């Protein structure tokens, strides 16, 4: 009975520590922490901590999402470092200790591709035309001389151009309803382990 009480008290302390973990971060950093979790890992702490995009995702997000006033507070002198320290604390519980010790933000890349074309044909004064938007063009025109004095002149031309369209894609894990669910699950696992020992 005494061992059960100690286990319950330990679980309560772990739950309180987990709840205080995210409370030390501003709201912008909290969303960065939850949005940086790789979708393929779910709530598996070891998987999250061994995924290289996790730490860089948190650091980069905090640098982009949090204003200077939220990066500078009495409790945390520089929030990206605090976010990295937060991730290091969580990962250490899963036995992962080779985490980066400073924030980083890799440059983002964008790709642009697309095509558009324009063609025109004119014969004996009638004209048909098909258009798409264009930014630059090259044209080729050929003229065929008439074969008899009564045959019309035919001119054909084609214009081809390329247009650009930009697509940005952002991926990340869905925000969980309860941000501290991973730490609470860890506390529950610890409680279960203590219960099995009894």
UniProtKB/Swiss-Prot annotation:
Keyword Metal-binding included in the entry's annotation: yes
Main subcellular location of this protein, as a coarse class: secreted
Signal peptide boundaries: 1-19
Lipid-modified sites (GPI-anchor amidated glycine): 172
Record: glycosylation sites: 107, 131, 168
Similarity annotation: Belongs to the RBT5 family.
Function, in words: GPI-anchored cell wall protein involved in stabilizing the cell wall. Not implicated in virulence, heme uptake, and biofilm formation.
Protein name, UniProt field: GPI-anchored hemophore cfmC
Organism this protein belongs to: Aspergillus fumigatus (strain ATCC MYA-4609 / CBS 101355 / FGSC A1100 / Af293) (Neosartorya fumigata)
Species classification: Eukaryota, Fungi, Dikarya, Ascomycota, Pezizomycotina
């Amino acid at each position: 009975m005494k061992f059960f009480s100690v286990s319950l008290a330990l679980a309560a302390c772990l739950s309180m520590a987990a709840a205080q973990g995210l409370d030390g971060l501003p709201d912008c950093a909290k969303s960065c922490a939850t949005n940086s979790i790789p979708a393929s890992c779910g709530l598996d702490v070891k998987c999250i901590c061994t995924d290289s995009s996790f730490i860089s995702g948190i650091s980069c997000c905090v640098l982009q999402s949090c204003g200077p006033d939220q990066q500078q507070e009495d409790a945390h002198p520089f929030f990206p470092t605090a976010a990295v320290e937060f991730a290091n604390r969580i990962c250490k519980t899963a036995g992962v200790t080779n985490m980066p010790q400073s924030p980083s933000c890799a440059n983002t890349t964008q790709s642009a591709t697309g095509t558009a074309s324009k063609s025109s044909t004119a014969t004996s004064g009638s004209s048909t035309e098909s258009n798409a938007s264009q930014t630059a063009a090259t044209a080729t025109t050929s003229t065929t001389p008439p074969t008899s004095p009564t045959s019309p002149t035919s001119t054909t031309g084609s214009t081809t151009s390329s247009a650009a369209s930009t697509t940005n894609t952002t991926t990340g894990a869905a925000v969980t309803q309860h941000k501290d669910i991973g730490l609470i699950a860890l506390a529950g696992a610890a409680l279960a382990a203590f219960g099995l020992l009894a």
